[in-house]
Amino acid sequence: MLVLTRKMGEVVTIGDSIRIKVVEMKGNQVRLGIEAPNDMRIYREEIYIKVQRENQIAASWSLADLEKAVTCLGADGKE
């Protein structure tokens, strides 16, 4: 892991298209501004972990589970 020290307003550049700027420091919190391509997803780690967990649960559904859901909803997708 690369560890950098930055002051208020200073920037870290990653590759050609990502810039991370220190925009505010208050107590033990730092606010970062991130410029990146629109197609790049940026998450706080706790949100990323939650999304990954939900994706794993969704991927673990079997075909039988999906068929039951479709049957419960009916052919038109309504209860």
Curated annotation (Swiss-Prot):
Q: What is the name listed in the Swiss-Prot or TrEMBL entry for this protein? A: Translational regulator CsrA
UniProt organism field: Geobacter sulfurreducens (strain ATCC 51573 / DSM 12127 / PCA)
Q: Which PANTHER family match?
A: CARBON STORAGE REGULATOR
Organism taxonomic ancestry: Bacteria, Pseudomonadati, Thermodesulfobacteriota, Desulfuromonadia, Geobacterales
Give the family, as the similarity comment puts it.
Belongs to the CsrA/RsmA family.
Q: Which domain of life is it from?
A: Bacteria
Q: Where in the cell is it found?
A: Cytoplasm
One Pfam family from the record: CsrA
Named from the GO MF annotations, one term is:
mRNA 5'-UTR binding
Q: What does this protein do?
A: A translational regulator that binds mRNA to regulate translation initiation and/or mRNA stability. Usually binds in the 5'-UTR at or near the Shine-Dalgarno sequence preventing ribosome-binding, thus repressing translation. Its main target seems to be the major flagellin gene, while its function is anatagonized by FliW.
